[in-house]
């Protein structure tokens, strides 16, 4: 299946149903009074994270999602039916951005997590709500409010513990094939990975971590050159970055300069990403003897000003790979993710008598009190009756 990590969709919540103006008309009951019911609330639009999805390709074609409108109120005090909600399923790791405001509405990081992205409109009130001792036959009603409407930008960010960095042909795909069951394309000629891939590295029955392979970076990537910059966002949730350096580049380029390009592009893209823990890993040491590889790796590290530990591996022959993976596993165990739970303020519970409806009733009472020409002997059959219309 084609990998798609960005999509734009339109979500429209349902409008609230209108209130009803109706009077009880029954045999032998000459003054039945008002019996107009309220409308129904509009349906909401929700996003739900689903671990069975791994791409946003479904939303390249289906771009509009609309919830159902609430039904209008009816006579005999019948309340309109609430509109049905719409649930849009997205892959785990999807970030939701409101295109109108640029606000990040939420990150879908757990399976089953739900996020309301469009709230349905409030129901309108029927004329039964406006009856009083001085207004026995009210002809007022309120209209339902419109539902929310938003253009959303969906951005899929892969959830991985370890991210791979490096130039094209540094051996990232070969490494992920060596340590996991993932099978990205590899070959003995220059080319680059086109889409990100994930691999699960199982150290034993209880310990494992996820590694992400993204297309290689090239010089000028921060300005849009190549593919890598587009997929760098997938590394934002990684806990450690493995910077693979080809110790003997096939094109004869300088490994030191290649490493500096990667670090420079990383800093241009995001200071937060550049500040993540980064490990230096020299690959393809099987192309020379051990002493030569160690001497060359040490010289490159010194040229880069690298003072921490570095690793020598061969992803093709798996030399040093197991030691590296165990060190990564130990780092992940010793540095667990700290979930900072924000103090959530209690949500305002708004039922039938929310602020909107209360305001409508208060305005109606003011209109009745200010009406100097009120006729308490008004008859339902009077054709000259006045109907009140309220605008939101």
Swiss-Prot record:
**Protein name as annotated:** GTPase Obg
Compositional bias per record (Polar residues), positions renumbered to this chain: 129-143
Q: In this protein, which residues make up the domain named Obg?
A: 1-159
* Keywords of the record: Cytoplasm, GTP-binding, Hydrolase, Magnesium, Metal-binding, Nucleotide-binding
Q: What is its EC number?
A: 3.6.5.-
Q: Does the keyword NADP apply?
A: no
A Gene Ontology molecular-function term?
GTP binding
- How does this chain assemble? Monomer.
Spell out the subcellular localization from the entry.
Answer: Cytoplasm
Q: Which InterPro entries match?
A: G_OBG (IPR031167), GTP-bd (IPR006073), GTP-bd_Obg/CgtA (IPR014100), GTP1-OBG_CS (IPR006074), GTP1_OBG_dom (IPR006169), GTP1_OBG_dom_sf (IPR036726), OBG_GTPase (IPR045086), P-loop_NTPase (IPR027417)
Q: What segment(s) does the record annotate as region Disordered?
A: 127-148, 364-392
Give, as one word, the top-level EC class.
hydrolase
* Chain intervals with Acidic residues compositional bias: 364-386
